[in-house]
Amino acid sequence: MNLIQIITTIILALFAACLLIQLLYYFLYFRKLAFFKDAGEISVKKAEMPPVSVIICARNESKNLKKYLEKVLTQDYPTFEVVVVNDCSWDDTGEYLDRMELQHSNLKIVTIKEQVKYRHGKKLALTLGIKAASHEILLLTDADCMPASELWLQSMVSSFAGQESHSVDFVLGYGAYQRKWGILSRMIRFDTFYGALQYFSFALSGTPYMGVGRNLAYRRELFFKNKGFGIYNHFLSGDDDLFVNMLATPTNTRIEIRPETFTLSEPKTTYAEWFRQKSRHISTGKFYKLKHRLMLGTLWASHYGIYLLGFLLLLVGFDWRIVVGLFSIRFITQSIVMGYAMKRLKEFDLVPFIILFDFFILLFYSILAVNNLFISKHKWK
């Protein structure tokens, strides 16, 4: 066996290993979301629903608040309040909130004044909002998010009202993006879907590791018992994923994927804006628990390996039909599982783009990773 044959054999073995790992993730984990059976319609009576505090942090969000706040304030729910933290806004956010407070008795405003000597991130605003909250159950969303229905609040917190509600501390929801024309919009939606496929599937498998602040519920008592965001208080990001990563367990976490539980946000309109947003979001991943880093690292390493090692096999003259055949096994499995999961999350129009975005997302995250090696500070707003 000459050197080329030895190298080819090694590359082929690694390629096969990456393929096997990918298939295992799809069959063992991702299929759980794809074929998940939810509880159907809400079985808990409205009178049995616990009081809820919705928390929204807003910095210069006047435009979005005017579009979406009313839909939050008028949810079909017996007892709830909406706490909006006006975090150092210099637009007309304050004036608009004052007007809305006169119209809605369930609106509570917390105002933070800017201090030149002290800069803070979203965690301070969120902490003050939670301190001002009157109720035990907290539902977090963002100023640029719109509930998908008037039953959003009922559906997201129904797990806190069932027979086993005492054991529930977290409910993870889906923060979707509105459908817009163009490749960027579809890529953002695919990236959001792929992230949700992971954190929902792993939660269903007994390994919850993150949630998104656009649609996340947890107990106020849990927040204060943990002394807020704990050891991550000084980090700019991580108000959602790191908090869940610290405290979520197989028994205290539920997911909600009924369409009425979704929130909808407008996607970024330029690649630069999306790049900055994602750069901030992924900066917290290195602080996840070791088992979660290994779990995600293995997934992404095998994902990269499929493309890189497949290319190397073609480069050394290996039979392209075998490479394409093996890659097709993964692609067919991926398309079936993702297709069903996309149908569950109302993203089925993305199915034709799976193979395209599957590759470009890898390139995008590679650039993000390199960028974050040289940028240590990120801004919330």
What role is predicted for each listed range?
Residues 31, 299-377:
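Membrane-embedded multi-pass helical conduit in multi-pass membrane proteins
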Residues 92, 143-159:
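Acidic donor-binding/catalytic loop of UDP-sugar-dependent glycosyltransferases
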